[in-house]
Structures are given as C-alpha cells and as structure tokens.
Amino acid sequence: MADIPADRKKIVQEGWSRLFSDIEQPSYIQKFPSQESLYVSFFEQCAFDDFDLTLLRFLKARKFVVTDSSDMLANAIVWRQQANLRSIMVRGENGLNQNFVKASMYFIWGQDKKGRAIVFLNLHNFIPPKNTKDMEELKALILYAMENARLFLDSEQNAAKGVLGLVDLTYFSRKNIDLDFARVFAETFQNYYPEILGQALIVGSGFRMALFEGVWSIGKYFLDPEVRSKVTFCKPAQVSGYVDSKYIPLSMHGQFDETKLYERAPPETAGIGKPENYEELDKEYVDAAKEFIRLTREWIYAAGKPQEAEIEEKRKAFKYECKKLWRKGVALRPPNIYQRLGLIDANGHVDWSKA
C-alpha cells in the first residue's frame, strides 16, 4: 500500500479523527437505514484503493481545510447509500438503458503517455434526456461508468494518479447541448469523485469548437476553479502529443474504432452474487470498517511514541487486506466490458497490452 507523504501525515490523521467523530454522531447515523449500512457505505467509498489516498483526494479538493474535507467525505458516504450505487452495480450493464450504453457517450480505453487511463466523452453521441425517466437512466449510466473508472485508479498501478479526460467534438452540434445535465454531471464528478481527473483535453476545431466554447463560457462555472485549471483545448492533430495512436479514435485520426468496442466483447453474464453472498459480504465490510477505525485511532494516539512504527505497519497491512476484500465485492457483480475483454483480471490488475 502507498505510504503517506511525510508532510501530509499529520493532516491525514486530523482528517480521520474529525471524520470518525462526525460519523458517530446520532444525527449522522440516522441518515442511514442502520449503523451497519453506514459502515458498509464508508468501506465501499474508501477501500477501493488506499484509505489514506481516498482521504487525501478529498483534502486536496478542499485545499487541505480539514473541516471542509471531512464534511465533503461524510456527504459522499451518505450520497453513496442514497444513490443506490450497490444496486446499479449489481444489475450491471443489462440493467441500464441500452440505447445510452450502446451510444458510446462515455467509455474508458487505453492510457496516455503518463500512464493515466483515458476516459472518452463523445459529446456528439450525447443523447439529452427528454423526461425525468431519461434523466434518472442517464444518471445511472454515468454512476456505473464512474464506479468502473475506480478500477483504473489503483495507486499501485496508476502512479500518475488520475485519468485523462478526452472530450471529442468531431460531430458536436446544438442537439447535443444540455446545460441541466452538464450541471448534474459536474456536481457528481467533483463532489463525490474528487481529484480523479488528472487532465482534460477538449478536442475539436472550426465551427464545432466555437459552438462548444459558447457552451463552455457558461458551463465552466459548474466546475471548481481547480478542475477548470486542468482543462486544455486542442486540435485533433495535437492529441498524439498526449496519447499513442492506437488509443486515439478514428475521428481524431487515430487507429481505435470505438464503434467496434461492444462487438469485440462477449455478452455480459449475470453476477455470481446471491442475496446471501451480499449479506455475508456486508458483515465482513462492517467488521473491516470498525477495525480500520480502531487501528487508525490507535495509530493517531501513538504519534511520537515507541510503538508508532509497529502500529503503522500493522495498519498498512490491514489496508491491503481491505483492498482485497473490496475486490471480493467486485467479483460478485456482473463482469464489466473491461473484465469481459480480459483487460482487468481477478486481482484487479489492468493490462492494456491485451487491448
């Protein structure tokens, strides 16, 4: 597991101390069906990588103000339960609106020259929701995609930390504009998945770029200034400076044909998880969350004492066991397209050489 940078150790400890105090308040607990479901949501939010790196993402998003960062993470834990993310992931792709899935509005493919996974946003394929049902189904698609994106953010493999967002404006037109959904997307992205974006490239030229710039003049204010600072506008010919040609779509003069992506993948199969499997898994999540909290408090109290190093190593080893337990939950779900293509193995290792 990752080591906390020496200059961030104290603020990470302060962040955990504040968060633990907050989530143990009766007023917070009552936001969940039960205290056990709180622990499950906490575990699923934080254990996908290294607990401390998860907290650091929230700290960085709030400029290392502990109270603001703790509140942000606490809100994300509540949101995760209220958004029924478990249900979305258990249903898998087949539980989503298939018109949205096959439209290839949002998908992950390849890595850039810094080793970051590439998240493609094909705005010309965006289908604006026509009613409340469409909006909810589109939200479910985005949440499903974002949860799968976390599989590519393992700090043991993704030393670059974050993804490259590649926004394709090749055939972008007025029919693809929906500022209401843009606001929903921005709020979800930056409030509940902070610091996942390493850089974003807006790729286009001519009239289509001019059209998008008009939208951007309004939409950019949905984003925090820190997120806006990561956005770069470029022409299709410049993308090769960031990404190898084999991962660049045909529309940007590359070799990757995204229209064939789902044709290559075997059909989705049902997940192996039964209700009783998830009940047992949740018990393990609850126990693990409680043990992480206990060990972290012990680590905080041991600061500067002879036993500090020993407790730190014990806690580090436990964080790794938690990551393996989190992957156990992933294995119960229907396999996503990247798993079906053999790009992600059972241990969570990503191998783009198989693309």
Curated annotation (Swiss-Prot):
Q: Which CDD domains match?
A: SEC14
Per UniProt, residues of the CRAL-TRIO domain are 93-260
> Per its UniProt record, what Pfam families does this chain match?
CRAL_TRIO (PF00650), CRAL_TRIO_N (PF03765)
Task: Spell out the Gene3D superfamilies in the cross-references.
Answer: CRAL-TRIO lipid binding domain
InterPro entries membership: CRAL-TRIO_dom, CRAL-TRIO_dom_sf, CRAL/TRIO_N_dom, CRAL/TRIO_N_dom_sf, PITP/CRAL-TRIO
> GO terms for biological process?
intermembrane phospholipid transfer; phospholipid transport
Per the record, what is one GO cellular component?
A: nucleus
What GO molecular function terms would the record report? phosphatidylinositol transfer activity
PANTHER family recorded:
CRAL-TRIO DOMAIN-CONTAINING PROTEIN C365.01, PHOSPHATIDYLINOSITOL TRANSFER PROTEIN CSR1-RELATED
Quote the protein name from its UniProt record. Answer: CRAL-TRIO domain-containing protein C365.01
Q: What is the organism of origin for this protein?
A: Schizosaccharomyces pombe (strain 972 / ATCC 24843)
